[in-house]
Design a protein with these regions (language model features):
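N-terminal pre-catalytic "stem/leader" segment of glycosyltransferase-like enzymes
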Residues: 2-112, 411-444
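A nucleotide-sugar donor-handling region in carbohydrate enzymes
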Residues: 15-30, 146-157, 165-243, 361, ...
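Active-site and donor-binding regions of nucleotide-sugar-utilizing enzymes
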Residues: 48-212
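Conserved catalytic-core segment of nucleotide-activated headgroup transferases in glycan assembly
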Residues: 58-66, 72, 206-281, 426, ...
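Donor nucleotide-activated moiety binding/catalytic core segment of transferases
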Residues: 103-120, 275-316
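A donor-sugar binding/catalytic signature common to diverse glycosyltransferases
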Residues: 119-150, 295-337
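Catalytic binding pocket for nucleotide-activated donors in carbohydrate/polymer assembly enzymes
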Residues: 162, 203, 284-286, 313-385
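C-terminal amphipathic helix plus adjacent low-complexity
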Residues: 356-428
Length: 444
């Protein structure tokens, strides 16, 4: 006979999934997405473009979009973004008002249907864990930067599966458009994909760097309302997650003011920082020194005369211009210890300043003398990491996406791939059995 408590337990077991489907919005949206896959055909003439999980629409996706909209009119482009009133979106609607594209709110039902039905999917980071690429779709991932900092499992103190969603995305991708061989190797190996990845990999430079090399400086100054009668300095420090916003704001204002004072009235210093810091600085009436989150950084770089950064990959994008780069790393030892670096900082194509006093002094060096001093380092980095950044990366990447011939396809494995699912891989007999079973395969 079933006891009362047992009956309640059985009832809960039966009703809990029903309650979750009715009340949990995430589960309902996931179910809707799967229904879209099941019930709809893939639209062969559609392209969905996404950048940085819909936070903005910039970088590689933005650069590719601008070429697609002009040169591939038979395709309908969809831009995924969280804020459909984003200033960049408004600019695009005005600039391309007669072109074949639409804007969709990120993770809305319309977005999920497009994710399920667009033939071409373009992303510079990753899709959410619920993403299931259909075999009829073509997923192009254009990773968002050459890494100075470690990635995936190479990050010091990283959790065992912290990189699981990036790994899944790269494994799902049909094509990876990489800026250089170094990035491809680090990205693939740090995400445990070496030897099992089946994606085609093309080395074409960063599509977004075309915007840095090919943009008209005066047009960009006007578009982003930047000063036109002074040299421009961009101060682009990395956001440190352990820092408080208030502390960061205070420190960055002090540092920016000191940089501006040192360079004098012939220069104007702009600060590009994290969204949280940006919002706080606007409240403090510091907007005349701020670059908003919505702007395309590579278009901004086309106007910049001197770059100050730290561990950000932005300096790789700026390097082809062969202008001065200064590295401001007051927390270098701590950052190397906690995060880890792929590159020897002694080889960087510019001077490292360990404190604001050193930076203020170093940025006053004469431009020609400074560039000559670091010429060997600059040329070495250009050869190793920027050799394909020649202003034609967008064209070559799109040819690659549309199945035109690619000269470089690396890491593509011809081996069969077997995936084991062992639940949580707990320390028990099931996990031990899977490990033992994995040893009987012929890996050659």
């Amino acid at each position: 006979m079933i006891t009362k408590d047992k009956a309640k337990e059985i009832a809960k077991f039966i009703t809990k999934p029903i309650e979750e489907n009715l009340l949990n919005e995430r589960i309902r949206l996931n179910a809707y997405y799967l229904d879209c896959i099941r019930l709809n055909k893939v639209n062969e003439q559609s392209i969905l473009l996404e950048s940085y999980h819909g936070v903005n629409f910039t970088g590689n996706a933005y650069a590719l979009f601008r070429k697609l909209i002009e040169s591939y009119p038979n395709f309908k482009c969809y831009i995924a973004i969280k804020d459909t009133e984003d200033p960049m979106i408004k600019w695009l609607k005005n600039e391309y008002k007669n072109k074949n594209f639409s804007v969709v709110e990120y993770e809305s039902k319309k977005y999920l249907k497009l994710l399920a039905t667009c033939k071409y999917l373009v992303n510079d980071t990753s899709y959410m864990p619920y993403f299931c690429k259909r075999k009829e779709q073509v997923y192009l991932n254009t990773w968002h930067g050459t890494p100075l900092k470690t990635l995936g499992k190479d990050v010091k103190n990283a959790g065992f599966n912290d990189h699981k969603n990036i790994q899944k995305n790269l494994f799902s991708a049909d094509k990876l458009a990489m800026p250089n061989r170094f990035t491809a190797e680090k990205l693939i190996k740090s995400n445990d994909l070496d030897g099992i990845l089946n994606a085609e990999i093309g080395m074409f430079g960063n599509a977004r760097v075309d915007l840095t090399l090919n943009s008209n400086r005066e047009a960009m100054l006007t578009k982003y309302n930047l000063v036109k009668d002074k040299k421009i300095v961009l101060f682009a420090p990395t956001w440190k997650e352990n820092d408080s916003v208030d502390e960061s704001v205070k420190q960055l204002i002090e540092q920016t003011d000191l940089i501006q004072k040192a360079l004098g009235s012939d220069y104007h210093v702009y600060l590009k920082t994290h969204y949280f810091v940006y919002e706080q600085m606007l409240k403090m009436d510091y907007g005349n020194h701020m670059i908003p989150n919505w702007v395309d950084t590579n278009e901004i770089l086309s106007t910049v005369d001197l770059l100050i950064t730290d561990y950000s990959s932005i300096f790789f994008d700026y390097l082809p211009l062969k202008k001065p780069i200064h590295f401001f790393m007051p927390d270098k030892a701590e950052y190397e210890f906690e995060r880890g670096m792929y590159l020897d900082l002694k080889t960087l194509p510019g001077k490292i300043s360990n404190n604001i006093e050193e930076l203020v002094e170093n940025i006053q060096a004469k431009e020609n003398e400074y560039l000559n001093k670091y010429k060997v380092y600059i040329d070495n980095y250009l050869e190793l990491y920027c050799s394909q950044d020649n202003g034609n990366s967008v064209i070559n990447t799109l040819k690659f996406m549309f199945n035109d011939a690619s000269e470089e396809k690396l890491f593509k494995s011809s081996k069969k791939v077997v995936i084991f699912y062992g639940g949580g891989f707990y320390n028990n007999g099931i996990t031990n059995s899977i490990i033992n079973l994995s040893k009987v395969f012929n890996y050659d």
